[in-house]
Amino acid sequence: MCISVAGHHKQKAAINGFTAISWFSRFISFFKLILRPVVVWYNSVMAKYPIFLELDSRRTVVIGGGAVAVRKIQALLNAGARVVVVAERIDDMMTALCRGTDAELIKSKYSKNYLAGALLAIAATNNHELNKQIYKDCQELEVLCNVVDVPELCDFFVPAVVKRGNLQIAIGTEGQCPAYAGHTRKKLEAIFTEQHGEFLAELEKLRKQIIENVTDPADRKTVLGRLADDESFEYFTENGSAQWQTFAAEMIDNLQSARQ
């Protein structure tokens, strides 16, 4: 009898344990469900990936015909993109901007069909419902979308840029305050001059020579690091390109001599 009771208690304990585990599993599942929006929000905030895109001859679409659209079109044309402009009204400024370029002007209401084959699209209309529809269509077609001034409807943000030759510095605020990015750009424009772009062009030439002639990877890294530093730039600005090249050649020779 005692054995039977003990067995009964063990069975009951096992059932209770199973029930506890079951409830715990349900709690964990519920907890994950509650946290999912938080995780999605966290990823949306933290997972921005800065990138410079090669847009040469790639189809891009700008929807809208106002001043903002004009600025976006100009930037895309400067990057070599093949721009398709869709707007119900196309003014003389837009026509003049696109004249002599590969841009295609389509005077029409927006249609999802215009997005076909595009790498990215920019919605620059003053119609919020239309902008939302453009974003939705882009998601379905896997086209990167930027709805101007609506961060939550953006797959990417267009940064403020300081450009000196091929030196480009992009400043972004993830759509939180583009005006602050513009303010920061002005400060950087005062620091980085056209000479920085010229210096970069000389570095590019020399880098090719170093890759061909300096066989040791560690030596290449050392030389390029020294030639790209502030002291080297100051020498370049004070003495000019020809003397800087002599300075660079001596630095390479000294390093290689030290290795022998």
Segment roles from a protein language model:
Residues 120-124, 131-157:
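ADP-ribose/adenylate-binding Rossmann-like module
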